[in-house]
Swiss-Prot record:
Gene: Grl65a
Annotated Pfam families: 7tm_7
Transmembrane segments: 14-34, 43-63, 73-93, 127-147, 162-182, 252-272, 278-298
Domain of life per record: Eukaryota
Keywords: Cell membrane, Membrane, Transmembrane, Transmembrane helix
Membrane topology of this protein: Multi-pass membrane protein
Cytoplasm in keyword set: no
Protein name: Gustatory receptor-like 65a
Main localisation: membrane
Amino acid sequence: MREVNLLNRFTRQFLFLIVLVTQICGVATFVYNSKAQCFRQSGFLRFYSSLVLIFLALFLIVTTSKMFHNLQAVWPYVVGSVIILVVRIHGLLESAEIVELLNQMLRIMRQVNLMARHPNLFRLKHLLLLLLALQNLLRSLNTIVGISNHSAEAYDSFLNSVILLIILAVLLSFLLQITINICLFVVLIATYSELHHCTRRISNDMDKLRLHSVHESGQFMVLVKQLQGITEKLIRLRQNVFHITVRIIRHFRFHWLCAIIYGLLPFFSLTAKDQNGFNFLIISALNIIFQWTIFAILSRESRITRSLCTFHLTNYHKETARTIDELLHQEIWERITVTIYGNTLDTKLLFKLLSISAFCAFVNRLEYLHI
């Protein structure tokens, strides 16, 4: 098997860096055991995450309790705080399941590497998606800094700095949980992409056998049996990838629901009366579009029909024909769609949400100008 190339080495280090930051922020409660080559729960990180959660809850309760006298003006902050707190609690309670899912993903990735005959699962497009996820995180934090600095005269300099740092830490912990979800989806996209390459390789081998002059020779039948066995392994591997994808989508559906609500809040509450407010709305829309793009890419990569279009050996071997039919049947019934509580996150829903959000932002702008 070939060695890990520079691109894959950098991508793996980038993913481990994201995990390290989540551990520092008290989001992740698991560590990677290099000897056992698996993830495991850490009692210290779980205790540390609980302390961070308690501090976060106290900070949000104190800050929101002082705003109830003017709830009509600050309700977006209250709702956003509740969303962040609920997501953190949900993540801590479900931390054992995410460790199980991560270990299953590691086992599947090793099987895919064996099928592909090389350890280089990630390609440049997957690294770019990860970098875009990091860019969205940093861009959201930078926008908060801009809005807070714009209203810095409401506090003295020291108090404003402390509050700004706490707000950034709270927001960072929430954005890191969404970023972890995106990273897992990108890994699944890379896995499906590698399965495409394996399928095309089998397809090309079958095309070469189809052009063989003697289709009844013993050597030919041995090669057909070998390809049939490889195809059956591909079927089982694709089933495993499909099931782990469904479990990950189901596990994080509550996180995605909260992320969508949090991303839409500015359109219902913020008035684009200056450049900072307008930039915040644009960045919120871009973040939602990027998340939907990840969903669309995952749904598209889970389809393998285009990789099977050149399987022509089925006319010469009935058992191979049944194997290919099983793979095609699996393709028809096992297509990934990202759903949350029965609602499919497709482009139609995205267009509806963005249209409603743009209308609300326009109405808020008109009310501000009228006042």
